[in-house]
Structure formats: C-alpha cells, structure tokens
C-alpha cells in the first residue's frame, strides 16, 4: 500500500484537547511551545490519515539520516484570517533540510509529529514524488504561510 497525504484523524481531536502548541506563545499550563520533528518514510510504507504517531516502521535509513528525523523550525504563530472553508493555518518557519544524507531506497513521504507529546502524536503527513538522495542535502521547501497555501489548514 502507498503513503497517502493527510491530516491524521487523531490530530483534530488532539487540537480540541489542547495537545499541540504551535507558535511562539502558549496559552496552557506550560509556558513552552512544543517541539516538532519531521521524519521521512519509504515509498513502500503505509503512512496516512490513520497514522496516529511517529513510528520507526517504514522510516528511511541511510548515511547521515538520524532515526526520528530532524527538528522543525517553529517560529511562526498559527493564523486565523477567515476565508471560505479554511479557518486556521500554520506552516513551519523554515524549509526542512536533511543534512548530507544518502538514502538509496525510494522515499516519498514526510511526517511532522509532536516530539514533546508523550505519544509523539502525528501532526501532518505530506507526500511528494518518490526520490533517492546520494551524499546531498535533501530539502523540502515549505509553502507560504497563508490561507491558500499553509502546510496545515483547518476548516
């Protein structure tokens, strides 16, 4: 089965329960924003809307890649500018750059997950054309943080 781009079903419930704290300021018991990570997955993995948390199953491995992925730069506050259909959106404040890596097995998916939460809850699953990398930096450029393009858009 293939990877499928999606917002994990549990993420919506996590939002209502106040589990994830995006942005630069936090309104809950702790005063620190959560730390998010991004992990890459093989094209043969099955990462989709039913993926509730980070898993090592199906994750890429290779020279220069650390299991669990990389830290996501999070200096962008979520926004809510109204609009038709989308009420809130958020995008990491920097591209996801996986240092000099060699990943010779085809991969096509990145999972963003909350590394602060005990369950490493999944935040988003994004797919792209299957690729491999040989001794190079693999970069996923983040979209503009706006109503139309935000990486995570909630209606």
Predicted segments with their positions:
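Small cysteine-rich, disulfide-bonded extracellular modules of the LU/uPAR three-finger superfamily
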Residues: 1-108, 115-155
């Amino acid at each position: 089965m293939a990877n499928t781009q999606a917002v994990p079903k549990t993420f919506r419930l996590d939002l209502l329960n106040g589990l994830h704290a995006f942005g630069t300021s936090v309104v809950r018991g702790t005063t620190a924003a959560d730390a998010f990570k991004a992990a890459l997955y093989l094209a043969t993995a099955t990462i989709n809307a039913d993926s509730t948390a980070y898993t090592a199953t199906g994750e890429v491995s290779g020279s220069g890649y650390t299991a669990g992925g990389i830290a996501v730069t999070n200096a962008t506050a979520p926004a809510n500018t109204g609009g038709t259909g989308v009420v809130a959106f958020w995008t990491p404040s920097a591209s996801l750059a996986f240092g000099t890596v060699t990943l010779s097995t085809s991969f096509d998916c990145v999972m963003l997950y909350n590394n602060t939460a005990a369950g490493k809850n999944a935040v988003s699953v994004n797919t792209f054309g299957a690729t491999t990398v040989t001794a190079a930096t693999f970069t996923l450029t983040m979209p503009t943080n706006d109503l139309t393009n935000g990486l995570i858009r909630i209606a």
